């Protein structure tokens, strides 16, 4: 691929803008400054601009540790969008593969691959999602059984699919809940149906993809190939 085409793809630049960037002398290929757009680059080449390594633009698969106070949308008139936490080009092409409420923290997956995200969000695939939940009131002795049978959500005709709950810390009213669907505010509504209230909610896992323990709130990384492939299994 020509270097100017590579820059257009990697930076979302026009051909004219790519030419201007090259003339600035801020682009290196394998640590050598290159000003010609005709230079050929391959997958083995290391291309940098202003000291930042650029990648050949293919589908992107991102894991974000969403902090509280950010919404999963491109625009919101009242809250920060989680996209401001990303340092990426062509942001308008990215979307969330499953959202979290503004006050919910944890794992969010972001991509520009619609087929991949559909595999996660489509109800027919029943993608597992695991949440750490802190409740306002003590954990009922019958909660696990009722959730495993399915509960009746307000304004819903059907029971929820069977969910798995385990107690993490009874003194702190802390549980882990795994669900297999993604209804609006589902976890909060499930515990409301049991007469309790969710005080704090944190998503730890989507399918086989677990939130990286090394990430701090607001940080992100690209998924490994194994994590990407796990969605199709």
UniProtKB/Swiss-Prot annotation:
Xref: InterPro entries: PsdUridine_s_RsuA/RluB/E/F_cat (IPR042092), PsdUridine_synth_cat_dom_sf (IPR020103), PsdUridine_synth_RsuA/RluA (IPR006145), PsdUridine_synth_RsuA/RluB/E/F (IPR000748), PsdUridine_synth_RsuA/RluB_CS (IPR018496), RsuA_PseudoU_synthase (IPR050343), S4_RNA-bd (IPR002942), S4_RNA-bd_sf (IPR036986)
- Catalytic activity annotation: uridine(516) in 16S rRNA = pseudouridine(516) in 16S rRNA
Give the source lineage, highest ranks first: Bacteria, Pseudomonadati, Pseudomonadota, Gammaproteobacteria, Vibrionales
Q: Which keywords belong to this entry?
A: Isomerase, RNA-binding, rRNA processing
The superkingdom listed in its UniProt entry is Bacteria
Entry's family note: Belongs to the pseudouridine synthase RsuA family.
Q: Look up the EC number in the record and give it.
A: 5.4.99.19
Catalytic residues of the enzyme: 101
Provide the transmembrane region boundaries.
none
Name of this chain's protein: Ribosomal small subunit pseudouridine synthase A
Q: What does this protein do?
A: Responsible for synthesis of pseudouridine from uracil-516 in 16S ribosomal RNA.
Q: Name one Pfam family in it.
A: S4
Annotated S4 RNA-binding domain ranges read 1-67
Q: Which organism is it from?
A: Vibrio vulnificus (strain CMCP6)
Q: What class of enzyme is it?
A: isomerase
A biological process (GO) of this protein is: enzyme-directed rRNA pseudouridine synthesis
Q: Which GO terms describe its molecular function?
A: 16S rRNA pseudouridine(516) synthase activity; RNA binding
- Extract the PANTHER family matched here: PSEUDOURIDINE SYNTHASE, PSEUDOURIDINE SYNTHASE FAMILY PROTEIN-RELATED
